[in-house]
Regions:
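N-terminal Sec signal peptide cleavage junction
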Residues: 1-4
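Gly/Pro-rich cap/lid or specificity-loop segments adjacent to the active site
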Residues: 6-285, 289-337, 341, 405-406, ...
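Ordered core of a single globular domain
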Residues: 312, 324-370
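Short linear interaction motifs
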Residues: 386-390
Length: 777
């Protein structure tokens, strides 16, 4: 069978325990790990040997060549990510083995290059000297040698050819493998391409600019979008230039919108095609001085952000915080003794018996025993390292020091500062671009590489890869790390390449789209000459009018009544903002969480600050809060909002106009996230009030009445020094004076304000409000 592996060469491959576990599978049955021994320098076979760590997941029915996964970095561990990747690549595993390996010197491969563990400092000449004293040659750690390691691994495991899936740096390794070892590759899928020939520094700014302008240029190619908004790319650039002038062209909540913030909009929406679809609308509104959709995006009022696929924490991640809780239950002397015992456990501990014995002797909770019993050797060693055992272990999500060594050979020596400046000069927004002038930094990096004795790779390495294998290049249109431009350049040199753009997605598509990249890979590998398509390749469906969430949020709604029946009694209101709905309920105030998806509305059980009212007010409160919790559908038509409940009840609201600053009695309803963010005032220790009246500010901060002068001009607001009118040494309720000090400190830092309906936002230096008040009727 094409996917079957014959026994490897004797003595070159040794079994090793996997540093991970796969749910529902048995190690040694469905998956295996091991170490391939390779020569550090293939021209010196009697020299130092290196251990290349790998993992193999057996196919359900191996009828296809294996898939070799090549991780990013360089230096990221594909082996560590196996639990996540096994799930993402499950469709491919049905008919082919999945292979993962870590680069020489990185991940779980040994020896692992870790300068801090070696010389207690970062990458530099001291570390390189220490490595050389151990027989390690930094010049042997590069993409060319890594490609040879991959080819040897396939041969040692008995595979004739393999399909490749590379992500980010892994695409460079895949291309080098196709160039230098073409016989072992059948086809390749490249996700977020950075080919060997790409001048990454010189082309970074151009690629970044392309990604940020792409949605507006794409809108111009869409008849509906162009018909609604016109030439959006030109409008986007013109607005950026206007925002870079003074006075500011647009205010967002009385805060000037800076050009850099608009240019960075891509950072808020990348990887979310549904959010990218809003960009032309946002720019159109900002161009006309409107900010509703932009504010809704900043306030996260457009719905929840889907979770990005991520590796679930291993047993050591769960063990360590639980073990610390156990130690906190002991005296300081006992806890110190247990820590010493743990640090003294043997590094090699078959079955984790020594760790289990310590836990039993110390009578730790059963949950710790259970976690320890199922730990892999690597997970147990992570526990030991956390308590002081000096182990050079792979640290998840850190690339390690091989990246610096690779870059000294393959990137930094080839940077041409003049070309970098030339490329940046063609961009019409040089003053607004991020700091892409690497000239000074590059000179220092080139000098550092020379001092470390690491020279450039052969010039041929930087030549274009022209391999004839079938290649599918996947590029996210919003990728600013390995921009789409890089994939376009790489594809131009490959005679049998197909470039597939994923609109709205950014970097490392496999980790953003879930199984969608696996579906594209499956289609391509089955029929390399045929087009591929999946949900993640769909064009952007641009939003032409403000979505419901924008029309709903940031506004105060007054209950008129139930359909056909007017609401009697005290005012009832609702303000939807930043995932919270707050307002008056007939007796006091209430608050709840909410989520909008399409026209569907989900509201958590409201929390009221006053449940002691009686009579008609109590009936109104109960009826309203019950209906609010049962609401599931929302409609906004102009200045009217309709809430429908599951039992058919319809609540009718009308929009309240923005109140003036002076006149209303303002009550504090929200503190910063570090405090009691979003809670009703009664859930603070004591109510906080404020009133602005002809240059004088008066307010209760919990116990004492304060007053001071204030000055305002447009959106600017400054309060004088707060002084209590009559100072009382309040002691009840507990913490009331601390509340006064905290609120006073925030008030003294106020520099600007904004009013939306009955809500008053006070800002300090941050873009987020420091305090939020609500106007009592």
């Amino acid at each position: 069978m094409p996917g079957a592996a014959v026994p490897g060469a004797a003595g070159r491959v040794a079994a090793a325990p996997c540093p991970f576990q796969l749910a529902g599978e048995e190690e040694g049955d469905r998956y295996h790990c091991g170490v391939l021994t390779v020569e550090q320098r293939r021209d010196r076979p009697a020299g130092v040997q290196l251990g290349i760590f790998f993992a193999r997941l057996n196919a359900v029915e191996p009828v296809q060549p294996p898939l070799l996964f090549l991780a990013g970095g360089p230096g990221a561990s594909g082996v560590y990510e196996v639990p996540l990747l096994a799930e993402l690549l499950a469709p491919l595993r049905r008919s082919r083995d999945l292979l993962f390996f870590d680069l020489r010197g990185a991940g779980f491969s040994q020896p692992r290059i870790d300068c801090r563990a070696t010389v207690h400092e970062g990458v530099g000449s001291t570390c390189m000297a220490a490595l050389r004293s151990r027989g390690l040659d930094p010049m042997a750690f590069n993409t060319t040698q890594a490609a040879a390691d991959a080819a040897e691994l396939l041969a040692a495991l008995g595979y004739v050819r393999a399909d490749l899936l590379g992500v980010s740096y892994g695409t460079r390794l895949a291309l080098e493998l196709m160039r230098s070892h073409p016989q072992v590759v059948r086809a390749a899928v490249l996700d977020s391409t950075v080919a060997p020939e790409i001048l990454t520094y010189e082309l970074q700014a151009l690629g970044d600019y392309q990604a940020r302008v792409w949605p507006y240029a794409d809108c111009e190619q869409n008849p509906r979008c162009r018909g609604r908004f016109g030439g959006m790319a030109g409008r986007f650039l013109a607005l950026l230039n206007r925002l870079d002038e003074a006075p500011p062209a647009v205010l967002v909540g009385h805060v000037p919108l800076e050009a850099s913030a608009l240019y960075s909009l891509n950072n808020l929406v990348a990887g979310r095609p549904d959010r990218v679809a809003l960009l032309p609308l946002i720019v159109d509104e900002l161009d006309r001085g409107e900010t509703a959709t932009y504010r809704a995006l900043l306030d996260q009022d457009l719905g929840e952000v889907p979770a990005v696929p991520a590796r679930v924490g291993d047993a050591s991640d769960q063990f360590l915080p639980r073990f610390e809780l156990f130690l906190q239950s002991l005296s300081s002397e006992q806890a110190a003794a247990v820590r010493r015992e743990l640090a003294g456990l043997p590094v090699e501990d078959p079955g984790n018996q020594a760790l289990l014995a310590l836990l039993a002797a110390r009578r730790t909770p059963a949950a710790l025993w259970q976690l320890a019993a199922r730990m892999t050797s690597y997970e147990r060693q992570r526990v030991l390292a956390a308590y002081g055992v000096p182990l050079a272990l792979y640290v998840p999500h850190l690339l390690g020091d091989v990246k610096a060594i690779f870059d000294c050979q393959e990137e930094i020596p080839f940077v041409e500062p003049d070309l970098l400046r030339q490329n940046q000069s063609v961009i019409p927004l040089p003053a607004l671009l991020p700091a892409y002038d690497f000239a000074e930094g590059i000179s220092a990096s080139q000098r550092s590489c020379r001092e470390m004795g690491i020279g450039p790779a052969p010039l041929a390495f930087k030549g274009p890869v022209t391999a004839t294998h079938p290649v599918l290049l996947l590029a996210g249109t919003q990728d600013t790390v390995t921009p789409m431009l890089w994939a376009e350049l790489a594809a131009a040199a490959l005679p049998n390449a197909r470039l597939q753009r994923l609109p709205g997605y950014s970097h490392a598509l496999l980790y953003q789209t879930g199984a969608c990249v696996a579906e594209l890979a499956l289609q391509f590998l089955a029929a390399p000459t045929q087009p591929v398509a999946a949900r993640c390749t769909a064009p952007i469906d641009y939003v032409l009018e403000p979505p419901l969430a924008v029309r709903l949020t940031g506004r105060t709604w007054l209950l008129q009544g139930w359909a056909g029946e007017a609401a009697a009694g005290s005012p009832v209101t609702a303000l939807f903002s930043r995932g919270r709905v707050v307002g008056l309920d007939g007796c006091g105030t209430y608050a709840a969480d909410f989520v909008v998806a399409g026209d569907r509305l989900e509201i958590s059980d409201p929390v009221a600050d006053n449940d002691s009212c009686t009579g008609a007010a109590q009936e109104l409160q109960r009826a309203f809060l019950a209906a609010l919790a049962d609401a599931w559908q929302v409609t906004v038509r102009g200045d009217r909002m309709l809430l429908g409940t599951a039992d058919g009840t319809l609540l009718v609201f009308v929009l309240e106009p923005d109140l003036p600053l002076e006149g209303p009695n303002w009550r504090l309803v929200a503190l910063p996230a570090a405090d009691e963010a979003g809670l009703p005032a009664s859930l603070q220790i004591a109510p906080v009030t404020a009133r602005f009246d002809q240059g004088r500010w008066l307010g209760v901060l919990g116990c004492n009445l304060y007053e001071t002068a204030y000055a305002r001009e447009k959106e600017q607001l400054l309060l004088g020094t707060l002084e209590p009118a009559v100072e009382m040494a309040c002691v009840f309720p507990a913490g009331i004076l601390e509340q006064e000090k905290r609120v006073a400190r925030l008030l003294q830092g106020v520099t600007r304000y904004w009013i939306g309906g009955r809500e008053l936002f006070l800002y300090g230096d941050s873009a987020a409000p420091s305090l939020v008040f609500y106007a009592d009727p």
